[in-house]
UniProtKB/Swiss-Prot annotation:
Originating gene: plsX
One annotated GO molecular function: phosphate:acyl-[acyl carrier protein] acyltransferase activity
Similarity annotation: Belongs to the PlsX family.
Keywords (A to Z) from UniProt: Cytoplasm, Lipid biosynthesis, Lipid metabolism, Phospholipid biosynthesis, Phospholipid metabolism, Transferase
InterPro entries: FA_synthesis, Phospholipid_synth_PlsX-like
Domain of life: Bacteria
HAMAP family: PlsX (MF_00019)
GO cellular component: cytoplasm
Known catalytic reactions: a fatty acyl-[ACP] + phosphate = an acyl phosphate + holo-[ACP]
Name of protein: Phosphate acyltransferase
Amino acid sequence: MKIVIDLMGADHGVLPIIEGVSRALENKSFSAVLVGDKDKATPFISKELASKVEMIHTQDYIKMEEVATEAIKRKESSIYLGMDILKNGADALISAGHSGATMGLATLRLGRIKGVERPAICTLMPSVGKRPSVLLDAGANTDCKPEYLIDFALMGYEYAKSVLHYDSPKVGLLSNGEEDIKGNMLVKETHKMLKAYDFFYGNVEGSDIFKGVVDVVVCDGFMGNVVLKTTEGVASAIGSIFKDEIKSSFKSKMGALMLKNAFDILKQKTDYAEYGGAPLLGVNKSVIISHGKSNARAIECAIYQAISAVESQVCLRITKAFESLKPSVSVPQSDQQDA
């Protein structure tokens, strides 16, 4: 299995990415292709690691402040070269660089799966249950039609079933209430269409994402990104509050010591790094979009994520799902009249 890793554009430079690749190679068997500035990368690559990876040199990359359309023009940029390698035989690509450039090039260079109108970013959210919830779209499509959300539901369902091995995953539609009548026009129309699928649970509220009420939560990319960023902010704030309170007294420190195992589990469940990255579903190869601030652990987990996606043949499974399930979507006649 060949995995392409974009070295450029991340917040903390090439070192965390190289360390993540090195750790993953210690635990999994795969061929790594590193794309980026050789002069910046070489000082951090040991002789042992150098014998295990292929290095494709380029100094150009899409900076975070640049518009995503620049990636289409810059054929020597790291993400463009990486996407070309993926298109021409590699199995997966991971990038912690410009997410818009990654999404745009993936769609243009790899192509969309037949029947998919818009690819979506799929992310894992912490849950009180034993398994995380799947949320999509997490930011690829800010303005959506009901048909797009149907695509997201199908792709999320297949990802949960194939990659995460969830039995009979349930899909919920994010709304401002559980009742069928709740939601804006997009939610109401999507709800009518999703009724055609057995996996559809119904509307869910924001709090349900973390309760394990459903396995997959579907929403437009604007709302999904707000949910994602809010979750990250709340988790960070709670962590800071805990640290400050623990340091406030000897009694608190002793109590924290006794609860260390519980705190470790909490940290693991809420740490973005443990989830790796966010798969871009709906294109013809496996692409993982990692957080710009990714540390070595996040890159390592993103590689494991990519391996699982390739081994489960999730792209093929999504293709088959769209061939067999999507044509069955229709709004019930009574609902059409009501609308």
